[in-house]
């Protein structure tokens, strides 16, 4: 599931920070504590610290505006410094037909040959277009968990207004999750996302191990195009 929201009002993040919780924002994974990040986020897809370093190198400072993103990272803690929530997101250009049928996209791609920004939007999103899966960690056992989620939503809304984005997207949530009601009460609506594939990597622990289970053709592509 993803949540989308079009917002027109302005909110000050100062009004969302309370005495017993605080939110920290960074613009690169290299400014995040590696051990803390990996403790809570590493098990979710390619979201470990080194994986985000790779994504930043691949999708920052590019001449192609569709592959040039701004990254941001949030950590919310209680007054004792205990982590309540961690997440990351990106700001970039999305094609409006990403969830449309193939025939619709083909027609639009023909138009984009001469008008690249045709039917595109500036989007703030949890995660990025390269990733799938749970893009945030919340310590649900803490009493302050719900307030931490609401503070995150306030901060994202402020960023949405500051950047004059067209859309704010929270993704990817399980169909039934703890924060459904909280998020929808903030004005978001649900959008069904395409099915994804999860590969259980129990049989390999390294790139070399993984390449051994590939076909000769796939192994050649992996070694030449992916590993570098």
Predicted regions and their residues:
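N-acyltransferase acceptor-side catalytic subdomain
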Residues: 1-228
């Amino acid at each position: 599931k993803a949540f989308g929201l079009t917002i027109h009002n302005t909110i000050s993040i100062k009004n969302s920070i309370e005495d017993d919780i605080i939110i920290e924002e960074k613009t690169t994974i290299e400014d995040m504590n590696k051990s803390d990040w990996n403790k809570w986020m590493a098990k979710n897809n390619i979201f470990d610290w080194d994986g985000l370093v790779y994504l930043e190198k691949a999708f920052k400072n590019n001449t192609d505006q569709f592959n040039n993103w701004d990254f941001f990272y949030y950590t919310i803690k209680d007054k004792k410094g205990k982590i309540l929530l961690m997440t990351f997101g990106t700001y970039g250009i999305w094609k409006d037909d990403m969830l449309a049928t193939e025939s619709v996209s083909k027609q639009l791609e023909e138009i984009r040959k001469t008008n690249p920004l045709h039917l595109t939007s500036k989007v703030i999103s949890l995660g990025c277009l390269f990733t799938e899966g749970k893009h945030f960690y919340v310590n649900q056992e803490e009493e302050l968990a719900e307030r931490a989620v609401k503070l995150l939503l306030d901060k994202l809304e402020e960023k949405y207004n500051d950047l004059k984005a067209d859309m704010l997207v929270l993704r990817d949530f399980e169909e039934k999750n703890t924060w459904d009601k909280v998020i929808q009460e903030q004005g978001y609506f649900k959008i069904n996302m395409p099915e994804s594939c999860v590969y259980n990597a129990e049989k390999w622990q390294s790139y070399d191990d993984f390449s051994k289970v590939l076909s000769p053709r796939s192994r050649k592509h992996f070694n030449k195009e992916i590993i570098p």
